[in-house]
Regions:
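Extended, alpha-helix-rich binding/interface surfaces that flank or overlap catalytic cores
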Residues: 16-21, 28-190
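Short, solvent-exposed amphipathic alpha-helical segments in soluble enzyme
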Residues: 10-12
Length: 190
């Protein structure tokens, strides 16, 4: 699991990971402001809520486990929630990096244009078999899977419109990449 790889990286570099709900992203640097929120809520024996952290950080990394997850976030049912998170970041001055882990040799948004979504092949095979009167017990998804070209165009639009930045890496490099994007050691990363 990719979160296991990240956690191993953090542990091997003596980084403590505190679990808390965040309004934007999955990872932030625990600044003095963040620590103050945690301390005050703990002193009052209150549960931390996402919005408690608004105004306490200005860089966040949201991680995606693969290309399918980001395709669903941008071009699928999860789009409204993902878009709202991007707008929330923009409205609160938070630089949001979306780190997409993948083994598809995608290293930039430009690479996404030529990314081949394996779900397209399955969709096309089922559609073809249906024309032959076969596999009729296998239903065809209502919408065709997202192509790399459509996904890349949507990413570029979101970058321009909301200031979100899409970054790519292999799963085994994700831990180091998260720290790099958060600002590394000069921001308390290492």
């Amino acid at each position: 699991c990719s979160s296991d790889l990240k956690n191993r990286y953090f542990k091997s570099h003596d980084m403590e990971v505190l679990r808390a709900p965040l309004p934007v992203g999955d990872y932030i640097i625990a600044t003095d402001k963040v620590a103050d929120v945690i301390r005050r809520k703990s002193d009052r024996k209150m549960e931390l809520k996402k919005m408690d952290f608004l105004g306490t950080y200005d860089v966040s990394v949201d991680t995606k486990k693969d290309m399918q997850e980001i395709a669903g976030n941008i071009c699928g049912r999860a789009h409204p929630r993902f878009r709202d998170e991007c707008i929330l970041a923009q409205n609160n001055g938070i630089k949001l990096y979306v780190l997409i882990e993948n083994t598809d040799k995608v290293y930039s948004v430009n690479d996404v244009f030529t990314w081949h979504n394996p779900r397209v092949d399955r969709y096309n095979n089922i559609a073809y078999m249906h024309t032959l009167g076969k596999l009729l017990n296998v239903s065809l998804p209502k919408t065709k899977p997202t192509s790399g070209k459509v996904l890349a165009k949507a990413m570029l639009t979101m970058q321009l419109k909301y200031g979100v930045e899409f970054v790519f890496c292999r799963p085994e490099d994700a831990g180091a990449k998260v720290i790099e994007l958060l600002g590394g050691s000069e921001n308390g990363g290492e």
